[in-house]
Design a protein with these regions (language model features):
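Short, structured coil segments at secondary-structure junctions
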Residues: 2, 52, 67, 169-170
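Aromatic/hydrophobic pocket-lining residues that form π-stacking "cages" and hydrophobic walls in ligand
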Residues: 2, 45, 125-126
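A charged, well-structured terminal subsegment
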Residues: 8-24, 200
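Glycine-rich nucleotide-phosphate-binding loops and adjacent flexible coil segments
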Residues: 113
Length: 213
C-alpha cells in the first residue's frame, strides 16, 4: 500500500512540506489484483486485496482447486492486472519470470510488488520498464543483488551495486530491507516451531515440519 499512495507523503510532512505535489495516488477499489503464487502467503494477499474491493486473479504452476481464487493463465493475469504481487518460489522455471517480455504484456501504469525472491525479476529489464514509464509504482522487499550485508547499516558507505543505486533513484520505487518476516509474532513463531521440532527429533518423535526432498 506504501507503493500505491507513497511513503513520500510522511517524509515530506516531517520536513514541514504539506504540499500535494507528486503525491497523486490511485484507488484500488474495483481494480484487478494478480497474485502469482497461490500458497498460504499468496492467498493471504488475495484476501487483503478483496478487502479493498478488488477483483483477484491467480496464477500458479500447480493451482490448488480448493483455493477461493479465479485462476487464469500467466498472460491473462499480466494483461488484466492493475496490481501484480509475486509470491512464488524461485526455481529454474520462475527465474526472471518478470522480464522484458512479460513487462510488455502488462497494463501501462501497473503496480508491481515483489516480497518473495529477488531472482523472480530481471532487474535490468525492470529498470528499463521503469524508465519507459510502464509502472505507476514498484515495491521491492527482495532484490537480485542481496548479499550477506543486506541487514547491515550501510548509510555511511558507498553502494557497490549500481543496480541498487539506480532503483533507489526512482521516485516511484520503494525498496525495503527484506523485512517482510520481521514482526514480533513471526519471530516468536520461528523460535517456538524450531525448538519444538528439535525436541521432537531428539525424542525420536514425528517431526511436524519435516523437510523432505
Amino acid at each position: 500500500m506504501g507503493s500505491e499512495m507513497g511513503i513520500r507523503d510522511s517524509i515530506k510532512c516531517r520536513e514541514n512540506d504539506f504540499s500535494l505535489n507528486g503525491l497523486m495516488g490511485v484507488d484500488l477499489y474495483k481494480k484487478t489484483a494478480g497474485i502469482i503464487g497461490t500458497g498460504k502467503i499468496g492467498m493471504a494477499m488475495a484476501r487483503i486485496c478483496r478487502g479493498f474491493g478488488m477483483r483477484v486473479l491467480g496464477y500458479d504452476m500447480y493451482p490448488n482447486p480448493n483455493n477461493d481464487i479465479e485462476y487464469v493463465t500467466l498472460d491473462e493475469l499480466l494483461a488484466q492486472s492493475d496490481l501484480i504481487s509475486l509470491h512464488c518460489p524461485l526455481t529454474e522455471q520462475t527465474h526472471h519470470l518478470i522480464n522484458r517480455e512479460s513487462i510488455a504484456k502488462m497494463k501501462d501504469g501497473v503496480i508491481l510488488v515483489n516480497t518473495s525472491r529477488g531472482g523472480l525479476v530481471n532487474t535490468e529489464e525492470l529498470i528499463e520498464g521503469i524508465r519507459k514509464g510502464k509502472f505507476f509504482a514498484v515495491g521491492l522487499d527482495v532484490y537480485e543483488e542481496e548479499n550477506d550485508k543486506v541487514y547491515e547499516d550501510l548509510s555511511g558507505t558507498i553502494l557497490q551495486s549500481s543496480t541498487m543505486a539506480r532503483l533507489l533513484s526512482f521516485p516511484n520505487v520503494m525498496v525495503t530491507s527484506h523485512q517482510g518476516f520481521f514482526t514480533r509474532e513471526a519471530l516468536e513463531a520461528i523460535s517456538r516451531i524450531t525448538l519444538e521440532n528439535a525436541a521432537a527429533f531428539e525424542k525420536g518423535e514425528t517431526l511436524v515440519n519435516e523437510v523432505t526432498k
